[in-house]
Regions:
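ATP-binding N-lobe of GHMP and related small-molecule kinases
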Residues: 1-100, 118, 122-128, 163-164, ...
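Structural motif
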Residues: 6-8, 149, 246
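DPxDG-like acidic metal-binding loop motif
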Residues: 100-129, 142-144
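Glycine-rich beta-strand-to-loop/alpha-helix junction loops that act as flexible
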Residues: 104-105, 242-247
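Conserved, helical-rich catalytic subdomain that frames metal- and/or nucleotide-binding sites
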Residues: 49, 143-242, 251-256
Length: 256
């Protein structure tokens, strides 16, 4: 199964909820860049309590796919899921850069949930999978829906399909690892007074093409300023737009 990257056409902070930040954002699937995830029969049996994940890159810390697996084990299909992964491994082919604002980890978790649901015929609805994903990561819900474009709000759990007009986009990822918690913490400490609820509301109704034609990059992503405060050498040209918490940015290919 392909596990696509995402871009944030705009990302506005609208408030806080405990340690989380409420957002209003346009997410689009960026289908030119994707990881692949699939299941293969294992050569030996596992405990069924943790996944055997084979990847082309080293994954540090707690793997978000394993986190998704643990959430699935809390459902009524615990034994079917555990039994399957005693004899199967997860193969992950990574192409999406990590710490780049492209949602690679969240996309992998969603692809794992969707693929497990299909492979084991669990018949979870998208709504049920989104509920399962709430303890995994805030961007996972968008990827579960498989929408090409959506307005995402709350802390990422509200995903509304959007009939969009998306120009051809080109993505660039500089060699700067962006820590999402660090960028959000910087926004909370230094930039909360920049919240613009009126603009956040206005952007939701516009197509991606209209947004990129009408607005400046610093108006569209509230995380650009804290990212640049932490990485002062990072500069964008006028026709370049910041995605997520960085460090990736994108621009329109050709004329809009």
């Amino acid at each position: 199964m392909k596990s696509y990257a995402k871009l944030n056409i705009f990302l506005k902070i609208t408030g806080t909820r405990g340690n989380y930040h409420e957002i209003s954002s346009r997410f689009i699937l960026y289908k030119s860049l994707f990881d692949k995830i699939y299941f293969e029969k294992s050569e030996f049996q596992h405990s069924g309590e943790d996944l055997n994940i084979i990847s082309n890159i080293k994954i540090n810390g707690e793997n978000i796919i394993n986190k998704a697996f643990k959430e699935l084990l809390k459902t009524k299909f615990k034994y079917e899921i555990s039994d399957f992964f005693k004899t199967h491994k997860v193969v992950l082919e990574k192409n999406i850069p990590m710490g780049a604002g492209l949602g690679g980890g969240s996309s992998n978790a969603a692809a794992f949930l969707n693929l497990t649901n299909q492979t084991l015929n669990l018949n979870f609805s998208k709504k049920e999978l989104i509920e399962i994903s709430k303890n995994i990561g805030s961007d996972v819900a968008f990827f579960i829906t498989e929408f090409e474009s959506a307005n995402v709000s709350g802390v990422g759990e509200i995903v509304e399909n959007f009939n969009d007009d998306i120009p051809n986009l080109e993505v660039f990822t500089p060699s700067i690892f962006a820590s999402t918690p660090e960028i959000y913490a910087k926004f909370r400490s230094d930039f909360m007074d920049k919240i613009d609820l009126n603009l956040a509301k206005k952007l939701k109704s516009l197509s991606t093409k209209e947004i990129l034609k009408k607005y400046k990059n610093y108006e569209l992503n509230d995380l650009l300023a804290p990212f640049q405060a932490i990485n002062p050498n990072f500069k964008l040209k006028e026709n370049e737009f910041f995605s997520g918490s960085g460090s990736s940015y994108f621009k329109i290919k050709g004329k809009i």
